[in-house]
Amino acid sequence: MHSQNDELEYQLDTLAIRTGHTRSFEGEHAEPIFLTSSFVYENAAEAAAKFSGEVAGNIYSRFTNPTVAMFEKRLAAMDGAERAVATSSGMGAILSVCMAFLKAGDHVICSRAVFGSIVALFEKYIAKFGVDVTFVDLNDLDAWKNAMRPETKILFIESPSNPLAEIADIPLLADIAHAQNAMLVVDNSFCTPVLQQPLKLGADLVVYSATKYLDGQGRALGGAVTGNHKLLEEVFGVVRTLGPSMSPFNAWVFLKGLETLRLRMKAHCENAQQLAEWLNQHDKVEKVYYAGLPEHIGHERAAKQQNGFGGIVSFVVKSLSLIHISEPTRPY
């Protein structure tokens, strides 16, 4: 058996296929799906020891499940993290982070360039618990510095952002956060661990919507948080108690997705680059947002921080309405 530190010495492709697979007594080659709500014990003493936490072991699948644990170990290894906690969705991951580290009177600084549901989470729901939120432009470092308060606990960003592919200076934002003992939380859903590892750039926690690229085929909802053991133990406590847990079947789907993640991300990057360059020359396109284009404001930063520019391209047309573009479009 290899420890997780040993596994970090392997290449990403090996980690994506082998990490976390704990075979049962059947000796199966592929990861099994443990579709069970709870677990049985040899005797009452064993049950008491596991329920009390004296002995590690599975109790209830809302807490831990072998298939989910395999996914968590694999994702953590790929992300260069000490630990991962899986959740029922990407928003479940972000909510779990908020519930773990925020209380009444605390303050969050969030990039304006984030997924719409994140804005709703902070403005409509987290605010109900007495947490104040300030939204700032992702690349205005002075705005981030000026927004800091003694009660600031979390800086939250997406990089690349959704949908305009703004690229954050993750190391500098980490420095701003850490100067006042706050945490930098990075949504890495668009890059995945294949293209970017924010923890190595100074982030404290990384969140994922596994629904997107980690699955890659639109089959299941899920999310995850990665980071160090101490922080992830707090997140795990929230997930265990409040219940935004990942299902064993979805975890198995994501395990299969991770196996092909590097190959898929390579193809996504190549296709997006070709599309962005074609759109950039089109006479009816006003502007293209893709960090792979040299004129993109975040191009140099993305080239430095990432191992590819990603698969999301956004663009603005000059005169046609959205309906004139979307109606003739057909899926392949």
Please give the residue ranges for each predicted region.
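Short, solvent-exposed beta-strand edge segments and adjacent coil->beta transition regions
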Residues: 55, 220, 308-312
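Conserved N-terminal alpha-helix of the aminotransferase class I/II PLP-enzyme fold
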Residues: 43-92, 117-124
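Short hydrophobic/aromatic beta-strand micro-patches
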Residues: 226, 314-316
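Conserved PLP-enzyme active-site core in the AAT-like
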Residues: 3-8, 16-25, 83-284, 289, ...
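Adenylate-forming
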Residues: 75, 93, 108, 324-325
